[in-house]
């Protein structure tokens, strides 16, 4: 299977500009004619750090009917591949417990919003609309938890696919036991052979350090992702088919307008300071008790990464390796 991830430096509140950037990347680096899947990050065209429902309202998109979906349908048909893209969904589900708006007035009806991804077939058919189940602090300022739990189902010629969005791979609300591995175990139980993660994953590295070597991946971040999929690595010891996980993250920085944030490493990002994204989009194949990195992008570069899931890996780590240690390329 040939897979591509489009790593973007999404600009807050500049949907048309971000779409134009994505189009320019695809024009300058045309995907192969036999591409099966193109994956974009979480909230790919809107930016991520919205501090309130009011701030994101102008950029909400009707369920599978807004600019992100329209773009995905167009690109899917143009390149003859599946497309997955993250977007802020305005549903027709009524929120029974709305919060007062900033002016102190609660509207008569408020519809639930979700942090979602839409999956489109090569013919432009909507195959899935997944709503993020585990919300990060930033999401909680405007989105509801997904109402159907994690997703694992057949998606056309892609086969059995598990879909996730960023925080989904973490312990629920950072409070569940570390080794519960809710998302990974759901994918495993569902028999997924492909796991697709759209992400807006933060880094604890300062902005200046992120800009020094933008072409180098944030290996500590990738190491953490692998840890969160330990059940797949362990299960692969007993044989069976390979499982491939695709991580499509974003790059760049945004102003933290939401609240004091804490990264997975425990670093606190104060309100009003910049938050940076870790990039490092990659694909990992789990087989024989090993996690094989097929290819990866840098922590600060925009572009298109194309790979074949049967490719020889850049390097791999085994189940018995200390995954908490920083990964190093050979």
PLM segments and residue spans:
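CN hydrolase (nitrilase-like) catalytic-core segments centered on the catalytic cysteine
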Residues: 66-84, 170-302
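N-terminal phosphate-binding loop and adjacent alpha-helix
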Residues: 6-25
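Residue-level signal for short segments within beta-strands and strand-turn junctions
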Residues: 7, 121, 285-287
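Short amphipathic alpha-helices and their capping/turn segments at secondary-structure boundaries
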Residues: 19-35, 150-152, 182-190
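Extreme N-terminal starter segment of soluble prokaryotic enzymes
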Residues: 1-5
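Cys-nucleophile CN-hydrolase/nitrilase-fold catalytic domain and related Cys-dependent amidase chemistry
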Residues: 15, 24-122, 129, 138, ...
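Active-site catalytic loop in hydrolytic enzyme cores
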Residues: 74, 91-194, 198-199, 204-222, ...
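Residue-level recognition of beta-strand->loop/alpha-helix junctions
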Residues: 7-9, 41, 49, 131, ...
């Amino acid at each position: 299977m040939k897979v591509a991830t489009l790593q973007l430096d999404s600009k807050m509140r500049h949907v048309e500009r971000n779409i134009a950037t994505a189009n320019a990347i695809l024009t300058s680096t045309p995907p192969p004619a036999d591409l099966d899947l193109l994956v974009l990050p979480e909230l790919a065209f809107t930016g991520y750090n919205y501090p309130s429902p009011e701030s994101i309202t102008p950029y909400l998109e009707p369920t599978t009917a807004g600019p992100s979906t329209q773009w995905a349908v167009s690109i899917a048909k143009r390149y003859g591949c599946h497309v997955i893209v993250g977007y802020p969904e305005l549903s027709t589900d009524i929120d029974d417990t709305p919060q007062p708006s900033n002016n102190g007035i609660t509207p008569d009806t408020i519809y639930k919003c979700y942090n979602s991804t839409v999956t489109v077939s090569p013919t432009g058919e909507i195959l899935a609309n997944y709503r993020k189940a585990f919300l990060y602090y930033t999401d909680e300022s405007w989105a509801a938890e997904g109402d159907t739990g994690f997703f694992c189902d057949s998606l056309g010629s892609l086969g059995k696919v598990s879909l996730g969005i960023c925080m989904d791979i973490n312990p629920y609300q950072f409070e569940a036991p570390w080794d519960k591995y809710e998302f990974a175990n759901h994918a495993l139980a569902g028999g997924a052979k492909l796991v697709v993660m759209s992400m807006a994953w933060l880094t604890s590295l300062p902005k200046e350090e992120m800009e020094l070597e933008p072409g180098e991946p944030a290996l500590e971040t990738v190491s953490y992702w692998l840890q969160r999929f330990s059940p797949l690595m362990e299960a692969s010891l007993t044989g069976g088919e390979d499982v491939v996980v695709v991580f499509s993250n974003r790059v760049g920085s945004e102003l933290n307008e939401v609240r004091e944030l804490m990264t997975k490493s425990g670093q606190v990002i104060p309100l009003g300071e910049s938050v940076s994204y870790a990039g490092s989009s990659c694909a990992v194949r789990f087989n024989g008790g090993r996690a094989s990195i097929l290819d990866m992008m840098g922590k600060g570069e925009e572009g298109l990464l194309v790979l074949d899931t049967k490719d020889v890996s850049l390097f791999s780590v085994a189940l018995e390796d200390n995954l908490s240690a920083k990964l190093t390329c050979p």
